[in-house]
Amino acid sequence: MEQQRISFVIPCYASENSVALVIQEIRDTVAQRPEYDYEIVAVNDCSPDNVLEVLKAEVAADPKVKVLDLAKNGGRHCALMAGYHVTTGDYVACLDDDCQCPMDRFWDLMAPVEHGEADVAIAKYVKKKESGIKNLGSWVNDVGSTWLLGKPKDLHFSNFAVMRRFVRDQVIKYQNPYPYVSGLMFQASSRVVNVVMEDRERTIGQGHYTLRKSLSLLTNAFTSFSIKPLRLAIYVGCLCALIGFIYGIWTIVHRLLHPMVMAGYSSMMAVLLFLGGMIMILLGIIGEYIGRIYIRINNAPQFVVRQSFNVEQAPSVEVQ
């Protein structure tokens, strides 16, 4: 019987002390199931430390390890897209480079996909062992994804997931320079499930995911997958117009009933500031969409590969 292959994609950034441990844990985990072959695609996301040399040593020691070295830091999701382009497995898994993803539970994560019950399985952590800022960012992304993508409220995204080959094939068709991989997986199939598990404490290095990055990721989600913010702008504009109309009628009636009362300067300024602020916010939303359309038209790349190791055919320098 021909072995099925699992491709593991690891975005790497500032992880010279942990990524080799993650790779070894993958080897040990797959060794438990000899009916599966595997490959490991590690993507150096322009890391400032010595992680590339660590990965090159892994390539020299193990032909199943592939490495992409990106010329510019584009973030985790761009690194994942680069890695997905060179995977050859029947199943594609993604995990972090910091030893926090519980690889000892990988076969539990794999089970619903392996048995045909789902096309994508994502780890759902009971309580994430992260900083309050990162947890807040995760919560913001979860709420935003539920509203923008139509994601069920009880479905949670995380960095530890596995998907079928056809889902990966659909994901890499996306050419926008601002990918949101979790949304792309959910867009490719509605058969997405969570597998409950507990993540590990961080024992090596420190996290680099900030609230700002979470908000940036949410912006990628709503400008790439939904026009709801534009519709919201219409609703807010109509509401402001209605409030202004009612206020205008009230002002006229009040003036007729109380002709000696001077018009209130402070209330007028408050209304002007409110409406001016709303107009700027709505123009900002529209501008964000237009700006990304402009960038897309100019063929801005998702990622740029400086060099690759043990990869038969590296992805195009610019994904177009």
Question: How would you label these PLM feature ranges?
Answer:
Residues 70-72, 76-86, 91, 103-179, ...:
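Acceptor/aglycone-binding surface of glycosyltransferases and processive sugar-polymer synthases
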